[in-house]
């Protein structure tokens, strides 16, 4: 079975999150000679496969086998993969069974490595991600088997295969402000406290404001208002409360505490409540780390281009891996049809991704 055959097999599993649909058991059977550990919880399955070749660093490949629901608009059955004009059509081709197939095949064919190789797979990335990669990492920490470096095979490329790897990700701070007032009659504004009028005074100083200047890897952390509501949709009653929701995709330069201080600067003296939640923590892997060099060199050899180092996009399970002080980066196929009808990737990309991972395994322990 080659890497394309393997991908076609993985795509045939209807693994809509959090159901792995038997795909993890298949991968376990496919990687003979690797020690398998399952950590399952609340209907989520997580699989860790590992093999120690010799003393040396521990390199892990990570990903997810679950996919989002197919939805409407497909020209073919989304769970019966088909090949048309060099492209493979099915749910999960880009996000991210192509990546899983590529690293599973590369690891399977590895005969010699100066250290330990492993694979971490979950069926809970597209959902809440509560019982997925996080709990497997906790288990690995308990048995002292956390990797030194990790590649997450999420689709990272933008317009050409090999053009971008993720060396970090922005974080995400979600916030809700409730400004309290006193409801009243619109004809008697002096007898009420209209929260809209108060908040309207500070909105120009807050909406779309950058909380930092960014750097060579991260753009500025911007205060983005996502929802603003008050009142009862009538014209003669002023509201007693206003709710404002916002999001900050934060770089490593801005913390949750910085966001709190920013809000307080403009709401100081007002009667308000603030709720903040850091749903993802920003991280950056030093571009001088061995895993970054190994992947860069491998892409240059296979694709003939030098990838840019990016932190753009949303969040992924790499944030959990980085939290355990593991050097983590992400690389995969072009991401132009992820979560869309007729999701597809090219056979050429899949084969090149497999070659890149094979070369990365070689380069990683060569310094």
Swiss-Prot record:
Cofactor annotation remark: Binds 2 Zn(2+) or Co(2+) ions per subunit.
Protein's UniProt keywords contain Lipid metabolism: no
Positions annotated to bind Zn(2+) 1: 64, 95, 154
Keyword Amino-acid biosynthesis: yes
Top-level taxon in the UniProt lineage: Bacteria
Keyword set, alphabetical order: Amino-acid biosynthesis, Cobalt, Diaminopimelate biosynthesis, Hydrolase, Lysine biosynthesis, Metal-binding, Zinc
Cystine pairings recorded for this chain: none
First-tier enzyme category under EC: hydrolase
The protein's assembly and partners: Homodimer.
HAMAP family according to UniProt: DapE (MF_01690)
Name recorded for this polypeptide: Succinyl-diaminopimelate desuccinylase
Lineage: Bacteria, Pseudomonadati, Campylobacterota, Epsilonproteobacteria, Campylobacterales
């Amino acid at each position: 079975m080659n890497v394309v055959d393997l991908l076609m097999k993985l795509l045939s599993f209807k693994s809509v999150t959090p159901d792995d649909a038997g795909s993890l058991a298949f991968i376990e059977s496919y990687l003979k000679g690797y020690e398998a550990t399952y950590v399952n919880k609340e209907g989520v399955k997580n699989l860790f496969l590992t093999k120690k070749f010799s003393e040396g660093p521990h390199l892990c490949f990570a990903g997810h086998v679950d996919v989002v629901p197919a939805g409407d608009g497909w020209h073919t059955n989304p769970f019966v993969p088909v090949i048309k004009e060099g492209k493979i059509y099915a749910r999960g081709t880009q996000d991210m069974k192509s990546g899983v197939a590529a690293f599973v095949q590369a690891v399977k064919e590895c005969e010699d490595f100066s250290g330990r190789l492993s694979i971490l797979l979950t069926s809970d990335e597209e959902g809440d991600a509560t019982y997925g990669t996080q709990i497997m990492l906790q288990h690995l920490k308990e048995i002292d088997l956390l990797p030194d470096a990790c590649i997450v095979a999420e689709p990272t490329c933008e317009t050409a295969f090999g053009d971008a790897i993720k060396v970090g990700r922005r974080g995400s701070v979600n916030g809700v402000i409730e400004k309290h007032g006193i409801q009243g009659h619109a004809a008697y504004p002096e007898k009420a406290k209209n929260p809209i009028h108060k908040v309207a005074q500070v909105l120009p100083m807050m909406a779309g404001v950058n909380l930092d200047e960014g750097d060579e890897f991260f753009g500025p952390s911007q205060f983005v208002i996502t929802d603003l509501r008050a009142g009862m949709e009538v014209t003669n009653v002023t509201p007693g409360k206003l709710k404002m929701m916002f999001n900050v995709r934060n770089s490593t330069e801005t913390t949750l505490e910085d966001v709190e201080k920013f809000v307080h600067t403009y709401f100081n003296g007002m009667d308000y409540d603030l709720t903040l939640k850091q749903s993802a923590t920003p991280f950056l892997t030093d571009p001088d780390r061995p895993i970054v060099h190994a992947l860069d060199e491998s892409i240059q050899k296979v694709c003939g281009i030098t990838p840019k180092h990016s932190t753009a996009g949303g969040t992924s399970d790499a944030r959990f891996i980085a939290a355990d002080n593991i050097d983590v980066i992400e690389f995969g196929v072009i991401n132009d049809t992820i979560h869309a009808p007729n999701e597809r990737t090219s056979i050429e990309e899949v084969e090149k991704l497999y070659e890149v991972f094979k070369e990365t395994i070689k380069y990683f322990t060569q310094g």
